[in-house]
Regions:
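Flexible loop/N-cap segments at domain edges
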Residues: 297-301
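Intracellular alpha-helical coupling/juxtamembrane segments of multi-pass membrane proteins
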Residues: 240-273, 277-283, 287-294
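ABC ATP-binding cassette signature C-motif
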Residues: 3-252
């Protein structure tokens, strides 16, 4: 019992010390269960790729981690520092030029940078922010954006690039939802290099397998409401996933066999029912409940 208590205490302490963690999180959207008592721990330095079939809840999980959504139950522990976030949907309320919107994430410094870009450069000279100005402009240019373009006039794909630029400038800790969408190969290569050099902690969703293979140091799969961790790169993930599913199928087969045996036993004649073991009956009820709660595998990732 003492050993179990120490193990549970260590698990709680580990989550508290993690950069970002979830404990027992449940999320239902429109009556659809996406997460069921899910746990996750993200350490500083992780580059974590979230995978799962369409509709499994990957974008919702990113929104939970970033604070845009709240769970139905459970706890999410976030860092006190800023996290640069690229959501799936660009906010409709953004207004201004591309440069001003990207620099905006830097707070007062960003306002000074935007003023400098507009020609009132005295604030930046006072704060010594020309190097930061160059960083903002470089990201904007590498993403193929016009810094002086009005945001409301841009296409949907170009607006997503603005959202990506904001995230990259905001923080070295990043949550990115499909960051390579609407990017050409050269820009994707630049983004990969930038993230490898600049990102401290990265959580991302991407259907670009080459991008995931180059960046991911961990893979977490969203599958039937649970989160499955694979401590490997994306290249080894398919093999590890097949191993997990095979083990799961074996466990389910044993459970189904046991359930069938117990159902046959409970249906025996009147004499057997009179002498049946009540503990065995309770175990059968529990088996039925476990089988009813099981969410069968649906499609491929």
């Amino acid at each position: 019992m003492a050993a179990r208590h120490r193990a549970e205490s260590y698990h709680v302490l580990e989550n508290i010390l993690a950069f970002l963690s979830m404990q027992g999180v449940t999320l239902n959207l429109g009556g659809k269960p996406l997460l069921d008592s899910a746990d996750l721990s993200v350490e500083i330095g992780d580059r974590l790729c979230l995978v799962g079939r369409n509709g499994a809840g990957k974008s919702s999980l990113l929104a939970l981690l970033g604070g845009q959504m709240q769970p139905n139950s459970g706890m999410i522990i976030r860092p006190g520092t800023l996290i640069g976030q690229m959501p799936q949907d660009v906010p409709e309320h953004w207004r201004g030029t591309v440069f001003s919107l990207v620099a905006e994430v830097l707070g007062e410094e960003g306002k000074a940078l935007a003023a400098a870009h507009a020609g009132a450069d005295h604030g930046v000279e006072i704060t010594g922010g020309w190097e930061r100005y160059g960083d903002v402009l470089a990201v904007i240019n590498h993403l193929g954006l016009n810094p002086d373009a009005d945001f409301t006039s841009l296409s949907g794909g170009t607006k997503r690039r603005v959202a990506l630029a904001r995230a990259l400038i905001c923080s070295e800790d990043l949550i990115l939802d499909e960051p390579t969408n609407h990017l050409d190969i050269a820009t994707i290569t630049w983004l990969e290099d930038f993230l490898l050099r600049k990102a401290r902690t990265l959580i991302f969703v991407s259907h670009d397998r080459a991008f995931a293979k180059r960046l991911a140091t961990r893979v977490v799969e969203v599958d039937r409401g649970k989160l499955h961790n694979y401590s490997c790169g994306f290249d080894r993930y398919p093999e590890r996933r097949e191993e997990r599913l095979a083990a799961e199928e074996r466990a389910f087969a044993l459970q189904d066999k046991k359930l069938a045996q117990e159902e046959a036993w409970i249906r025996q004649g009147i004499k057997a029912r009179r002498t049946r073991n009540m503990g065995r009956v309770r175990a059968l009820v529990a088996l039925r409940a476990e089988r009813a709660a099981r969410r069968d595998k649906q499609g491929n990732v």
